């Protein structure tokens, strides 16, 4: 009798397990009648879209609200599971079209000036890139002669591989140099009062229960008395660990890094570091992260490692899309987070809005103003570069850190 009970119990358990396996391996039947999709199923490339974003109504609820892969252009079948009004699992299937309809990004001045005989290269002066295409066609329409004085009306045209086009008109003024005149003793320059931002004023304006006030430093600040810095009210410091000497250049340790980080830690300041990068590939960025990790291995950081990339003058020659540049930054930050450090991306407001659009990392915002209107997520705000604080004899950047990790 016991043997029969054991056999029956084992069989029951087997059937339950078999049912679970079948439910996993055999998807629910397709039923596209229980929901309604939006009319236009064109999805912008690199956009963060979930299944629910494309459904206007459903008789039940979505079970698998997955994020769609939008990194590849073209038609893509989407399959998801939902429960219908009868609480039965069904499968919805539809097709989206991932498209690139974004114009290339062009930054230029409304007018340029050059002396007759100048070797000005306008193509190098103008920033031209694209969200998807790593090598958009960028050209100047119209004729001009750098050896002939005059005003030339020109048009800068940028076209990507998906035929998106940006056209911007601008003016080139080619001028003759002014004739030499008799040398005269120049009038004495007016003395102007130096405009500075006092650390105490920043504390008075921005310190509250959710914020801390600190600084970021490098070799440009020289020798620092961190005891005075702390006594002045600073609670943290971001220390430059080093920089890259141009595109494909060597990595150089900031000559003040060791004394800065050691003295900051000795005075019980919270410490993070940043690296000034010219990386033009994911491989290069990971290599830089390894280098930074090696420099900081003997120190205890309580704040993030920041990736500081600002070489926009060299960007035209890098053959990177905007998405590709974001991948470069992510490669650096992924590497440091793999070693259980926090990663952070440094950028100014305009660059964060226009260029650093395809990442999910914390942001160190640079925006020199009393009250920033940057409306995306950031954890630290560099609000000035002309700060003054006891313990430092030169100007210094002042920062606000948000304790709840968000602003």
Predicted regions and their residues:
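Solvent-exposed, low-complexity, repeat-rich "mucin-like" stalks and linkers
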Residues: 26-59, 102-133
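Extracellular interdomain linker/stem segments of modular secreted and single-pass surface proteins
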Residues: 97-105, 173-181
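Substrate-binding cleft of extracellular glycoside hydrolase catalytic domains
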Residues: 207-232, 238-331, 337-339
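N-terminal Sec-pathway targeting helices
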Residues: 1-14
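Functionally critical loop-and-helix segments that line ligand-binding/catalytic clefts
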Residues: 182-217, 358-407
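Aromatic-lined carbohydrate-recognition surfaces of secreted/lumenal glycan-active proteins
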Residues: 340-353
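Hydrophobic alpha-helical membrane-insertion segments, chiefly the h-region
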Residues: 15-25
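Serine/threonine-rich, repeat-prone extracellular segments and beta-strand-based repeat modules
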Residues: 57-94, 133-174
């Amino acid at each position: 009798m016991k043997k029969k009970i054991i056999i029956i119990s084992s069989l029951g358990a087997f059937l339950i397990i078999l049912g679970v396996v079948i439910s996993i391996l055999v998807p629910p039947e397709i039923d596209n009648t229980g929901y309604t999709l939006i009319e236009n199923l064109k999805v912008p490339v690199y956009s963060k879209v979930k299944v629910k974003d494309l459904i206007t109504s459903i008789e039940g609820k979505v079970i698998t609200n997955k994020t769609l892969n939008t990194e590849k252009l073209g038609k893509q079948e989407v399959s998801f599971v939902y429960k219908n009004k009868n609480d039965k699992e069904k499968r919805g299937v539809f097709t989206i079209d991932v498209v690139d309809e974004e114009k290339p990004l062009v930054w230029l001045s409304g007018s340029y000036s050059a002396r007759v005989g100048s070797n000005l290269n306008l193509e190098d002066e103008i920033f031209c890139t694209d969200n998807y295409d790593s090598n958009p066609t960028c050209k100047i329409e119209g004729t001009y002669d750098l050896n002939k004085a005059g005003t030339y009306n020109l048009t800068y045209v940028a076209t990507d591989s998906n035929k998106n086009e940006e056209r911007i008109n601008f003016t080139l003024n080619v001028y003759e140099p002014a004739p030499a005149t008799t040398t005269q003793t120049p009038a004495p320059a007016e003395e102007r009062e130096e405009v500075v931002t006092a650390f105490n004023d920043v504390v008075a304006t921005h310190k509250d229960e959710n914020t801390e006030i600190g600084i970021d430093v490098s070799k440009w600040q020289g020798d620092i008395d961190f005891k005075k810095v702390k006594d002045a009210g600073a609670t943290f410091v971001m220390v430059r660990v080093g920089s890259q000497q141009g595109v494909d250049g060597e990595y150089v340790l900031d000559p003040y890094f060791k004394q800065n980080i050691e003295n900051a830690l000795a005075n019980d300041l919270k410490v993070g570091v940043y690296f000034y990068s010219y990386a033009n590939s994911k491989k290069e960025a990971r290599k830089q992260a390894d280098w930074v990790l090696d420099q900081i291995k003997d120190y205890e950081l309580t704040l993030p490692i920041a990736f500081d990339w600002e070489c926009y003058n060299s960007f035209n020659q890098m053959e990177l899309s905007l998405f590709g540049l974001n991948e470069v930054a992510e490669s650096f930050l992924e590497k440091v987070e793999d070693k259980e450090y926090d990663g952070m991306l440094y950028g100014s407001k305009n660059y964060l809005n226009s260029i650093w659009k395809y990442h999910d990392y914390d942001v160190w915002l640079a925006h020199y103003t009393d009250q920033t209107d940057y409306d995306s997520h950031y954890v630290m705000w560099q609000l000035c570069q002309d700060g003054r604080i006891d313990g430092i004899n030169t100007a210094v950047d002042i920062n606000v850190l948000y304790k709840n990790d968000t602003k």
